[in-house]
Amino acid sequence: MIKVKKLKYRFKSTSFEFNFDLNSTDIVGVLGKSGSGKSTLFNLLAGFLSPNDGSVFLNGKKITFLKPSQRNISILFQDHNNFNHLSIFENIILGIDPDMKQTQSNLKIVKNIMKKVSLNIDLQKKVSDLSGGEQQRVSIARCLLRKKSILLLDEPFNSLDPGLRKKLYEDVKSMSLTNQITTLISSHLIEELKTVTDKFLFIDKGKIVENKILSYNQLLKNKSFKEYLQ
């Protein structure tokens, strides 16, 4: 379970404040206009930004000022976080083995996760030689492999074709439910998000509307959300 309480962050003249609770296995779509605070929220949760005030609790433990490496949270940005000088295998297995050992066990793990993201390429190939969509799938594979308690996906599949996006959304949903992972997905592709969840956080002007999860039908009653859809 994750609890965010009066989490405040200020950048120049812009202020953000977040309040909400999420349970294990919750899959939540995070919606809002560009600049509303979606990426800011993810960076605060992951520890890449330090808040000016407030608290973040994960399973009852306060993690507000822990380093990113000390949090049981995995994050995937729209711009993939790959190491271009490393191979596909090394980039993926790095998620669970910092030494990147080419054991039979590790090779099997990487091949299996590559199948899940429809990546049918020589795993010894350098990531720098891949297309943008292929590089994104490498990032997704590494992220899925880590199986952290919290999974943050920031516009994760936008560069991929609709068929693969649908498959990956299904994989994320299955993995989240099976492993009791709390998953937040930021995306403008609302119709696709609705295929995996009816739980949403809508960020408007730096704050979460009603400070809680709302269903899509509940959001439709909100004036700001209606304007967002136009």
Question: Can you name each region flagged by the protein language model?
Answer:
Residues 126-130, 134:
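Conserved ABC ATPase signature
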Residues 46:
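Helix-to-loop junction immediately C-terminal to a conserved catalytic motif
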Residues 62-77, 98:
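ABC ATPase NBD coupling module
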Residues 162-164:
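Helix N-cap at the start of a conserved alpha-helix in ABC-type nucleotide-binding domains
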Residues 104-122, 174:
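Conserved ABC ATPase "signature" region
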Residues 151-155:
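Catalytic Walker B motif of ABC-type/P-loop ATPase nucleotide-binding domains
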Residues 207-229:
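Conserved beta-strand-loop-alpha-helix hinge in the C-terminal portion
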